[in-house]
Amino acid sequence: MKAVGALGLVALAGAGWAVISDDAPEYSVERVVDGDTIIVGNDAGETGIRVRLLSVDTPEMDGTGELEGCYAHEAKDYLTELLPTGTAVELDTDVEDTDRYGRLLAGVYLAGDDALINAEIARGGYGVAALYQPNEKFYPQVKAAE
């Protein structure tokens, strides 16, 4: 990746590729909250970072773990299978990097893998593509995976 020039990085970013700098923090999954939200920590010692996966929406669970939407537990279980505790992940943000709840908004990748976890949720049938303007970067991949 270091051999790619600045224009190449811009072109890759525009094409929907994850462009994560070499000095980006390394993250690991602490736990899965629901089908589209995880908690991560990083190698800088920060813990409890709440991450909302962009461009995908799954059934919601309330704070007690009770169902608010059909298949909420199944969506959470599926994401837990994809991202068990301790899994190394890479995060890629878009135009707005946090939401009104203070969650980091990101595309999530297994470390060293180019498969977008956000799209894998839709591909598995546990979520649907959702466009949250102005964040559009991951929407085409998630929509295509439905």
Give residue spans per PLM region.
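Small beta-barrel nucleic-acid-binding modules, primarily SNase/OB-fold domains
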Residues: 2-146
